[in-house]
């Protein structure tokens, strides 16, 4: 591609030229292969859950039952289908918009020359002909040609060519978009942008599917488990209805399909995407930009935070520690500060002079002193000297510098020894020292004023934040390239402990061979260390690997281009404020505010998100098992019937109210949270089983022919005998069972949100339910109650077979205490099972701290893990089977496409650019 405009290198393009070139070449980005909105909606209609709803609706209307067609059930199912499809669509779109908005906040920028002025510019606005400035850490934003004079660039092109060694590029040579500048500084002129660049052409050929996150795996397994459970249960129900009770095939088929529809997790995608999108926006308010939504769930389980020292735990600026000042003789500490500031530059000063002058606070304290001569620091003298006239008119010379230099100038042997001792003591702590001296006789003799030490001090909030993190079960480990002594001193000041491991020890702990796996002893040492000193980027990657090998979920912070591999390797990669483009690209979360406190806030937020997701999953499993289990036993034992439209109504109310859980008030956790499907299954099944027993036992109570006659409690006809139209269940029986079933299902939302008893609100359990949750639950419970009391039995939406009639207040007021008793019993089971798993988790966490093989896991703890592990294995096999079937055609299509376009060439000016695509690999 030839340039339409050749701009002068000292002026850059003008605004008019940029507009012309943007019209010609477009924006500098490779647009992802977006799915049209209509196809997204269509895909939702073709989703397996939607198809089940649609099939159930069609069967309800098409298959007559006792000569009647279930048009009411059909309409309700179609409405539920619309609700599921459109709520899911809008939730996904809102989540995508949230990520896009957050990504815009961290959009890559570049240094660009336009209209004769250098400034920051979004990378996507570059056009051919732009002049850009490149330095170490920058991701090259577009194909360019190096120009001007400066230090040659070392460029990492491994993402483009696979070559692991950096290459050197000089002015006049071409560089490619997507490569990373390792070192050097030069200007470049953009030659190709977007899809016209080398990288862009390759990306245009490839469609890389997004990686499936851990949360998606959990949700898939829950869906598969419930679907298999529903298929097995419904198959038996169908056999019982048609074989044992000799019901009409139409009735049996309609009933089974509606039950199946009520059991499958219809609202799961809506709830999960809403929870994550809400969480991402909450994180953005805390200056943490989420680039991968599933990272929110993974961050909740983070056990170790490997944090950079400089700029994250510390202020990244030298500071004078007033508590460490040694004042000599009759001089005070204030004298030491005053004389050190007199011999320092106040304007355009270096880091040391800035630390010294900042310690005094205000220049007014030296306003009365007149500097007649100032000798700046130089590598030979290693000191600064100021000739001064004091406010009283006396002549004074002050100096500050390397303590050994100042010590050699002193006449007093005791003062010289004090300097030597101070140097040795501070050096052992990794502190930089300065000596301060004065002369009253024009430099003939010098007397010691005192000694000061400088350090990069911890942030004011770092110590408390680290304590907070430790109280939350997150071990903060400092990672620094500074020397060992500095790391020890910083850890001591932060209250982190002093077990520091050096980077060279990390590399020495590798196994032999090509795998590069950490040694078991290294793994244990990394786990026990409080920090790491003398660390290079490759050490960070190995530290993360060692901690992960110990079974820890690791968060890693970084800011440099070479930190990208470690950020990618970590369970949660965190790019700190001021990070390079390469680090941001590899990170899951990007911080826009300095300090570790933002990370801790993000952990708190992520644990709240986990709580909401876990609550929903337990509730969804409990509700599905309760509904299926009740109908299984009620039909098997009592030939129980309920109008299908009532079952659809329960499902619709359930899906509508459960969405409110996305906004419910929850507490964070004092310890990392991990998915324990055995625990979740046990809690869900215990709640469901109590509900099943309660509802099944209620059937004979509302059937006088099976148990006893209802007393005449009101003017309504009593429930005495079953109907005589061949239906086994009367309308009032249906109403009372509907009230009991819907009541338990709705109340379980309140039950599952609290790991303790539902009424126990505390920081350790759960806060009071939010109005957003209480309002729909209360409304639906009230509506169910009024339907069970007042419904006119002559209104038969789906025909004569399906009976439903209000049973009156007296009967309803007897059912509600019954429901409440079983609900409380379920709560006790939930708490008891939770306490067992909490104890097991404590044992497993304690065993993590021991070297493998030293301690054995108790048998009962292993037994608790078996159901979940077995379910995971079965789900993995089923997922692999489905994935293989679904991707078979896609792989064939891609293979054919790559064979057709194995070599893509584009003539550009006088040369050729070749892109070789092999198999399915991305160049």
Kindly give the residue locations of the regions a language model identified.
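Non-lumenal N-terminal regulatory segments of integral membrane proteins
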Residues: 1-118, 124-127, 132-140, 145-154, ...
């Amino acid at each position: 591609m030839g340039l339409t405009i050749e701009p002068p290198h000292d002026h850059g393009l003008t605004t008019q030229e940029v507009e012309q070139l943007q019209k010609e070449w477009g924006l500098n980005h490779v647009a992802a292969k977006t799915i049209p909105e209509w196809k997204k909606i269509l895909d939702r209609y073709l989703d397996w859950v939607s198809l089940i709803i649609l099939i159930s609706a069609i069967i309800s209307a098409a298959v007559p039952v006792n000569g009647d067609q279930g048009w009411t059930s059909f309409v309700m199912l179609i409405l539920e289908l619309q609700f599921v499809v459109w709520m899911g669509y809008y939730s996904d779109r809102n989540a995508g918009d949230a990520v896009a908005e957050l990504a815009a906040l961290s959009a890559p920028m570049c240094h660009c020359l336009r209209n004769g002025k250098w400034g920051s510019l979004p990378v996507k606005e570059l056009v051919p002909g732009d002049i850009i400035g490149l330095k170490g850490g920058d991701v090259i934003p577009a194909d360019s040609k190096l120009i001007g004079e400066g230090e040659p660039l070392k460029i990492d092109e491994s993402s483009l060519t696979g070559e692991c060694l950096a290459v050197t590029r000089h002015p006049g040579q071409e560089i490619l978009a997507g490569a990373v500048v390792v070192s050097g500084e030069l200007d470049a002129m953009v030659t190709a942008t977007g899809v016209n660049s080398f990288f862009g052409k390759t990306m245009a050929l490839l469609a890389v599917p997004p990686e499936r996150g851990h949360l998606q795996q959990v949700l898939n397994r829950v869906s598969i488990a419930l679907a298999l459970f529903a298929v097995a249960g419904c198959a038996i129900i169908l056999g019982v209805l048609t074989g044992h009770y000799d019901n009409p095939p139409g009735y049996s088929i309609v009933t089974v399909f509606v039950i199946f529809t009520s059991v499958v997790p219809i609202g799961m995608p809506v709830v999960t995407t809403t929870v994550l999108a809400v969480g991402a926006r909450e994180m953005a308010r805390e200056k943490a930009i989420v680039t991968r939504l599933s990272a929110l769930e993974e961050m909740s389980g983070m056990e170790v935070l490997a944090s950079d020292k400089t700029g994250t735990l510390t202020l990244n600026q030298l500071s004078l520690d007033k508590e460490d000042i040694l004042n000599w003789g009759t001089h005070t500490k204030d004298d030491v500060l005053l004389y050190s500031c007199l011999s320092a530059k106040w304007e355009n000063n270096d880091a040391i002079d800035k630390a010294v002058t900042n310690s005094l606070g205000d220049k007014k304290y030296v306003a009365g002193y007149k500097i007649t001569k100032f000798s700046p620091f130089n590598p030979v003298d290693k000191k600064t000297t100021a000739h001064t006239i004091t406010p009283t008119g006396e002549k004074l010379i002050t100096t500050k510098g390397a303590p050994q230099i100042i010590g050699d100038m002193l006449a007093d042997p005791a003062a010289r020894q004090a300097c030597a001792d101070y140097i040795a003591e501070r050096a052992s702590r990794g502190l930089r020292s300065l000596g301060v001296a004065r002369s009253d006789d024009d430099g003939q003799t010098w007397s010691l004023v005192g000694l000061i030490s400088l350090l990069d001090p911890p942030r004011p909030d770092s110590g408390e934040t680290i304590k907070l993190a430790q109280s939350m079960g997150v071990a903060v480990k400092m990672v620094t390239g500074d020397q060992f002594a500095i790391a020890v001193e910083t850890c001591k000041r932060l209250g982190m402990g002093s077990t520091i491991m050096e980077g060279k020890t990390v590399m020495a702990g590798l196994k032999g061979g090509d795998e590069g796996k950490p040694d078991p002893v290294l793994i244990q040492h990394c786990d026990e260390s409080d920090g790491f000193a003398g660390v290079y980027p490759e050490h960070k990657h190995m530290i993360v690997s060692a901690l992960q090998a110990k079974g820890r979920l690791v968060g890693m912070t970084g800011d440099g281009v070479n930190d990208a591999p470690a950020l990618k390797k970590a369970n949660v990669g965190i790019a700190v404020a001021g990070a390079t483009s390469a680090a941001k690209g590899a990170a899951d979360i990007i911080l826009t505010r300095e300090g570790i406190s933002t990370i801790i806030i993000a952990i708190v937020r992520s644990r709240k998100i986990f709580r909401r997701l876990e609550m929903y999953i337990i509730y969804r499993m409990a509700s599905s098992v309760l509904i299926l289990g009740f109908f299984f036993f009620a039909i098997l034992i009592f030939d129980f019937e309920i109008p299908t439209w009532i079952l659809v109504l329960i499902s619709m109310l359930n899906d509508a109210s459960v969405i409110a859980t996305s906004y419910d008030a929850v507490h964070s956790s004092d310890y990392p949270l991990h998915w324990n499907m055995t625990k979740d299954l046990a809690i869900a099944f215990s709640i469901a089983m109590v509900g099943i027993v309660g509802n099944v036992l209620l059937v004979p109570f509302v059937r006088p022919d099976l148990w006893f006659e209802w007393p005449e409690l009101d003017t309504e006809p009593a429930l005495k005998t079953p109907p005589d139209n061949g239906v086994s269940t009367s309308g009032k029986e249906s109403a009372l069972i509907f009230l009991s079933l819907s009541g338990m299902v709705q109340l379980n939302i309140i039950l599952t949100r609290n790991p303790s008893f539902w009424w126990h609100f505390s920081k350790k359990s759960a806060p009071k339910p939010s109005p957003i949750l209480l309002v729909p639950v209360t409304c639906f419970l009230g509506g169910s109650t009024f339907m069970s009391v007042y419904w006119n039995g002559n209104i038969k939406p789906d025909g004569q077979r399906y009976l439903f009639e209000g049973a009156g207040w007296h009967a309803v007021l007897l059912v509600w205490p019954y429901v409440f008793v079983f609900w409380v019993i379920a709560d006790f089971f939930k708490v008891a099972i939770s306490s067992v798993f909490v104890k097991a988790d404590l044992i497993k966490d304690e065993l993590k701290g021991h070297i493998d093989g030293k301690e054995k896991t108790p048998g009962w703890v292993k037994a608790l893990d078996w159901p979940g592990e077995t379910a995971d294995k079965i789900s993995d096999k089923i997922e692999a089977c489905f994935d293989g079937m679904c991707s078979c055609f896609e792989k064939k299509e891609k293979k054919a496409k790559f064979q057709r376009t194995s070599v893509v060439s584009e003539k550009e000016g006088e040369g050729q650019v070749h892109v070789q695509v092999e198999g399915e690999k991305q160049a």
